[in-house]
Amino acid sequence: MKLHNITLKGLALGVLFVASSCSDDFLDTKPDGLIDADDVNATMQKDPSLVQSYLTGAYMNFYNGGEWRTSHDIYGIQGLRIALDMMTDDVTLPRNAQWFSFDYQLDNRMSSYRRTTATWRELYQVINDANTVIEFLKPADDSEPEGDVRKMLGQAYALRALNYYYLINMWQQPYSVNPDAPGVPVKTESEYRPERVPVKEVYDQIISDITTAYSYLEGQNITDKSSISEYAAAFIYANVLMFTGDYAGAAEWAEKAIKGGRLNSNADMLSGFNSLDMPEVLWGYKVDTENTSYYGSFFSHVDTYMPGYGGQVGYRKLIASELYDQIADNDIRKKWFGYEEDYNLLEVDFSYEQGNGWLPYLSNKFRDKYLTSLGAEGPFTSDVIYMRVAEMYYVAAEAYYLNNQPEKAQEVMTAIMSTRVPGYTCTSTGDALYKEICVNKRIDMFEEGSRLFDIKRRNESIDRALSENAPIAQLDYINAVKYKGQDDKMIYMIPDAEIQNNPEITVQNP
């Protein structure tokens, strides 16, 4: 179905574009008046600030889920990333209750559940926002956009690519399993394919979008880390190519992304991961008292010492002992874990963990600004970090290894790990080198949402029984202890609401 024209209600443009980007009211089959699409496009080209609210809205909807935010565990991308991490072997939830417990039990994928329905809607909501920006700003004569138009278009294309990347990898098995498998519907600014578009064709759209995004963003010198830059676009590109098996390309794009930041110092590593000013950050969301989602927020669930769900409420997420045991004592990341009296300013009770011998597994990696500033900042106003250059070092190292360039993999590992472990030099070879890359990525990216996609891409065999702080008896009862990354339980089912309203979807996931 081609969308050749846009019809707009006969409102003054200056009023129309102040509206929130989460609305589709600009589409109207029976308008009071018509504005030609070319006229709209020309107006936007002259004054792209008229479209800024849509791009701003896209970023906000990505952060908090917009109108589809339904509860304290469904609040945009960071809620989803916690859910994805809970499906892995990195994190344990000893009490196996409260928010994210069904994700931990690998039992939150059914077509009627909140997780699948809200996530589907949240991701497509951002895609719709991006489509609106592209439709309004894309030059009608296919000329090269310039200035702010070029920057805004680049960001919109990158957002669209990223959201399709999440959709295709949560609703279908990895590209390598079957490129022809039914994927997800694809909407762009000019075309809507409501059927389950094959996996390869979804990836073709993603690669086309992220290629365009990077070409528009390159050299634009976007220094505001709450906006997607060329380095953030390269980050997306590298991860996409890891799934398609283009390891030479993945290494190349990861190296480009790495140029956008510098590795953390020891002080940075222990700062609480709560500010976009951290040197490794490429992209994130600036949170303040106006846009915080408070208890339904990332730091409410991951800060061990705050009055949130992961702190005073008591449903703490611990590092799996199997992973913790692989962190060297002289590794700065070891200090991300274990009870710290100086951090416990609100006197949170840890008697449950202490009684079970689990104090070493408490997480200190994420600490809210409210505590690190000693109350100078508001509660749960910590910035949310989406991308760090550290991840790209591990992506580059793995890509080099898989592309039969072990010396390059060693070089990249030495570069990042020497900032984590004093005097580190990577000399491992063969399988030991690959394990070193994968394990250190798990440690570095703890609770940052990357682990599940790695498990799926590699089809890893997971055994949660290797961690003594996991509630194995409860997990075993529901068959959530041992599994493989490409088991059916690792993909979501298409939401009932989508199937009921979209007759073109005729195949459901198992």
Regions found by a protein language model. Name each.
Residues E191, A251-I385, V389, D444, ...:
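Hydrophobic-face positions in mid-chain alpha helices that act as interaction patches
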Residues M1-S20:
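Sec-dependent bacterial lipoprotein signal peptides
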Residues L3, C22-G79, A254, G314-Y315, ...:
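Membrane-proximal, proline-rich intrinsically disordered regions
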Residues D38, H72-D89, L93, Q173-D180, ...:
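Short, surface-exposed recognition loops and adjoining beta-strand edges that mediate ligand/DNA contacts
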